[in-house]
């Protein structure tokens, strides 16, 4: 299941790329900018700003899951079925109710990917799998990567690597570049902020490096979590000394995804303001350069 295909991307690997976003993630990062990607199933998004006062179409279409409330709709999400999702989106005249998640075959996705092959060839671009976590759907990920390789298309995967190694290993021959998150090297803060296990990520990174795969490390910098010199040094040291990568990207925290939490009726448990730490960003770049890495800041 996917939730988006983005063509003409220039920020998810080299050149012009098509990014396929797969649903499902094994982490629960507090700052996640794509909360609609976490579940492997479809999600219902509700935008109260588009809801028409006095309209009862959705409540009539699915009275067991929709109730009118003072400030819009009360949705009993735990009761939603695929049939409800279809009925609700079909009846809503303003698209206040929309569904995130679509089942597509490898052939359907590749039809879209192949349309832009001339642009990939000219720019050094290709296909990027993102998410969510692409390796939460290992068979689909491998099929798309293999089909792209057979078509002569460069492949990249944006991944948190918080999955069993057996989900990753079969796809290795078909992956040209890993855009790998390295959020923290210490297990306690990693667990607190992502509900995950840092050791699993570090172990998978070491295995990728041992396999000779090209890796670009990506570091989201979040105040209160890892936006400090000690954490930045530890992450950079691991990337340089343990993985021997050549490139690291620092991604300052932003709040562009907050509205998605409202649409999903989810709490937002991350800082409410973007990271404002120019001195830290300067330090991160300078320290990475001292360690022999090419460092880039990405917004």
From Swiss-Prot:
One GO cellular component term noted in the UniProt record for this chain: cytoplasm
Subcellular location, record wording? Cytoplasm
Residues binding S-adenosyl-L-methionine, per UniProt: 31-33, 132, 181-183, 254
Query: Could you give the cofactor binding note from the entry?
Result: Binds 1 [4Fe-4S] cluster. The cluster is coordinated with 3 cysteines and an exchangeable S-adenosyl-L-methionine.
Its Enzyme Commission number(s) read: 1.97.1.4
Task: Name the PANTHER family for this protein.
Answer: PYRUVATE FORMATE-LYASE 3-ACTIVATING ENZYME-RELATED, PYRUVATE FORMATE-LYASE-ACTIVATING ENZYME
What this protein is called in its record is Putative pyruvate formate-lyase 3-activating enzyme
């Amino acid at each position: 299941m996917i939730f988006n295909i983005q063509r003409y991307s220039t920020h998810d690997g080299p050149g012009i790329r098509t990014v396929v976003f797969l649903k499902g993630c094994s982490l629960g990062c507090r700052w996640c900018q794509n909360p609609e990607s976490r579940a492997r199933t479809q999600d219902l998004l509700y935008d109260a700003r588009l809801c028409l006062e006095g309209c009862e179409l959705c409540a009539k279409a699915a009275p067991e899951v929709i109730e009118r409330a003072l400030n819009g709709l009360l949705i009993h999400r735990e009761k939603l079925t695929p049939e409800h999702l279809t009925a609700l989106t079909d009846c809503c005249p303003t698209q206040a109710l929309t569904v995130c998640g679509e089942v597509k075959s490898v052939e359907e996705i590749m039809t879209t990917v192949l349309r832009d092959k001339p642009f990939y060839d000219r720019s050094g671009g290709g296909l990027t799998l993102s998410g969510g976590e692409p390796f939460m759907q290992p068979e689909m990920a491998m099929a798309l990567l293999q089909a792209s390789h057979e078509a002569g298309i460069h492949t990249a995967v944006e991944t948190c690597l918080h999955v069993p190694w057996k989900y990753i290993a079969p796809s290795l021959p078909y992956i040209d570049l890993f855009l790998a998150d390295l959020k923290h090297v210490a297990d306690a803060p990693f667990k607190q902020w992502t509900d995950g296990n840092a050791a699993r990520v570090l172990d998978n990174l070491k295995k990728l490096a041992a396999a000779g795969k090209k890796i670009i490390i990506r570091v989201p910098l979040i105040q209160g979590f890892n936006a400090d010199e000690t954490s930045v040094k530890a992450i950079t040291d691991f990337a340089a000394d343990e993985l021997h990568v050549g490139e690291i990207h620092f991604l300052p925290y932003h709040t562009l995804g907050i509205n998605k939490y409202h649409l999903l009726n989810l709490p937002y448990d991350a800082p409410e303001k973007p990271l404002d730490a120019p001195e830290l960003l300067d330090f991160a770049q300078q320290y990475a350069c001292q360690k022999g890495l090419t460092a880039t800041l990405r917004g």
